[in-house]
Amino acid sequence: MASLSRVLRVAATCPRGRAAWNLGLQPLATEARPTTEKSVPYQRTLKEEAQGASVVPQGPSQPLPSTANVVVIGGGSLGCQTLYHLAKLGVGGAVLLERERLTSGTTWHTAGLLWQLRPSDVEVELLAHTRQVVSRDLEEETGLHTGWIQNGGLFIASNQQRLNEYKRLMSLGKAYGIESHVLSPAETKSLYPLMNVDDLYGTLYVPQDGTMDPAGTCTTLTRAAVARGAQVIENCAVTGIRVRTDDFGVRRVAAVETEHGSIQTPCVVNCAGVWASKVGRMAGVKVPLVAMHHAYVVTERIEGIQNMPNVRDHDASVYLRLQGDALSVGGYEANPIFWEEVSDKFAFGLFDLDWDVFTQHIEGAINRVPVLEKTGIKSTVCGPESFTPDHKPLMGEAPELRGFFLGCGFNSAGMMLGGGCGQELAHWIVHGRPEKDMYSYDIRRFHHSLTDHTRWIRERSHESYAKNYSVVFPHDEPLAGRNMRRDPLHEELLGQGCVFQERQGWERPGWFNPQETAQVLDYDYYGAYGNQAHKDYTYSRLLGDEYTFDFPPHHHMIQKECLACRGAAAVFNMSYFGKFYLLGVDARKAADWLFSADVNRPPGSTVYTCMLNQRGGTESDLTVSRLAPGTQASPLVPAFEGDCYYLAVGGAVAQHNWSHINTVLQDQEFRCQLMDSSEDLGMLSIQGPASRDILQDVLDADLSNEAFPFSTHQLVRAAGHLVRAIRLSFVGELGWELHVPRASCLPVYRAVMAAGARHGLVNAGYRAIDSLSIEKGYRHWHADLRPDDSPLEAGLAFTCKLKTSVPFLGREALEKQRATGLRRRLICLTVEEEVPMFGLEAIWRNGQVVGHVRRADFGFTVNKTIAYGYIRDPSGGPVSLDFVKNGEYALERMGVTYAAQVHLKSPFDPDNKRVKGIY
């Protein structure tokens, strides 16, 4: 039997593109022969795609029902978990259709690893539920063992930044009661004697991590689901999705078609894995994912490896999974092989392993566990996996088709995320929204212009695959799929040193570096596939400089922008914002129902408000301006009958807002429409004590407090161009937003800059907004304000019209919450020591962990680190203001605690004078 070291020698001498097994290493090839590997649930012939399909039994495993409440397509991990959780929620008439047999496609050959700690609180919760389902719930319900093995997990750090990341994970784990330990190299050696620790800085050990058996888990899931009335039908390929259009012109799912008949249903769940895009096309739904080859090898027996924890050596981009008395070795490479033509006939097929691609993982594995150099290879597994543009799954209801849900694109994490995601998807289907904040997985996180853009999907999916094991730094940005959407000021700001961030395809200003130009170049695939890697790439170098959990090297440049805004004025290009018009005969009714605040004030008023879901969770925060009819239609005042409201929403979440509003309009059958003018209008925000003096030279309007109060808007002329000026602030200063027709953006910007030159006006970006807004206590949606947070918990009760009798979406939930008391509450904490924090730090109160930080940044005006997070009472009681005030607090950063002071109001300008122009 060939050893791993021989593979390295052969690969080193083998010409590029030539198969290593042509040199006589037949045992290393995935040839067509029977296999009975433990990880393979069925005795099949493993073949390349070109060698043909496995034999498929004729006819479905049981008769098709004529109707179903829900049809799940795909019998892999997500399909089985979703069916199980639908059944647990009491959904009758739930049917799972599998083209071949359960686990076919990807699930059957997955490694089945479960790691409990990830740099996301929501993912930690999802993983915890999966672990509970496979390690306890299923066995209690069915009496069957799922194949769960708890052997622990070990993360390897071979540099200080990686160890810092692990310390952050350890602190987050304390908020969830997850046991973990940061070990020294010597302690690691004691735990794992076969490991080379000479190059280690340390490790993170999580004793209760483990592995799952895909076949055992899926079999047990479906048995439990069937016991609750669900149906599982194998050998039944879906051939089409029938769609109907209702009386309001809304497309809805009507039926699922198969070769053996159709099933009428209002709801379809696409859990088809690498075939999900094809299923989406059947219904006219865009599914942005790509299929790639993903591989691991299984070694021969290794003496002394039994009971060792699974290992992730992130810096070597390799994992080592315990498999009895052997190891599975796999990882993520910079040059994965795309599966260009996804075959329908590949249910239990495997590809031949490309040793040129896989060799790098062997090198990393041998370095970490040297005994592998002399260990033989028992088998290779190279199968298809689906990957997405941001390495997050695709879930939720498709914006193109009501009743069509996604549960696909799991980036090799479908087993470990399956339980949590299956539960949330079931809630999504039954209740309209998930229980947790699933925005990072929601298909609506992508702008509709990107979800069928082939180049963008391919580039971003490649980069997310290649960086799967990279450290997750706070200020990282993608290099792939850039320059998709640029506003009219892009080139102007680039020439002034703007370092851009990417959000929903938009290039938005991050911060300014006047010393050099940082153009974002076309994606080079990190030099893979014959591409020439960029040299002297300024933008990439600036990003790399910020790869730290300390204060970044450009910290002082963000400081200059912030202090200029507080002391004089700054201009923020916010043109990437979503800008919608809600108009029509029922627009007022829709506004009453959609918005938590009373927006039905006289035309000329602007209101900060939230949009809620049925459970009272916050789906959005935004500003709504009521408009008066114009004399003629324009980008600033569309023609309308009835009422019209102008909505300005964060650009990073604009598609989510658009979809949420349209869903509510459809459900309530309001006779109004939502018009998207995001590309037609730019947006400049001029903020600071000098903003009035600057703009008074540019605008033809009286900007005094009496003539132009806070939270009002007017149509004015700026340097001769008609604009909408709104007196608002995202940073806690006197200031105005200018909403400008696209063609006028550049001349208006130049006029503002010219007028501001003598007042000290500077360009500033979103890094400055992050710091300035946290000082003032303004919320950021999807950070300290999410769909699982109510406005009452978040300190935003003032945005809710609870003192009126006007019904609005989520009102009943808020009234119930107010009556029973808040079980958690958002608090503000500051740390006297100058220490960087970015979120996920544990919050200690009186010696107990009571929560974790959602959002943190450094406040340059107060010269302190500021953190916001939700806390609970460990006894389970309501969290009152007295509970908040009467505690001693500390924040744990990377295992070190820092004393913290709690604030009931924002630490900067708590009396709210500056936005009123009182300095």
Swiss-Prot record:
This is Sarcosine dehydrogenase, mitochondrial. The modification Tele-8alpha-FAD histidine is found at residue 109. Its cofactor is FAD. The keyword Acetylation applies. It is found in: Mitochondrion matrix. It comes from Mus musculus. The modification N6-acetyllysine is found at residues 174, 560, 776, 803, 885, 905. Belongs to the GcvT family. Its main location: mitochondrion.
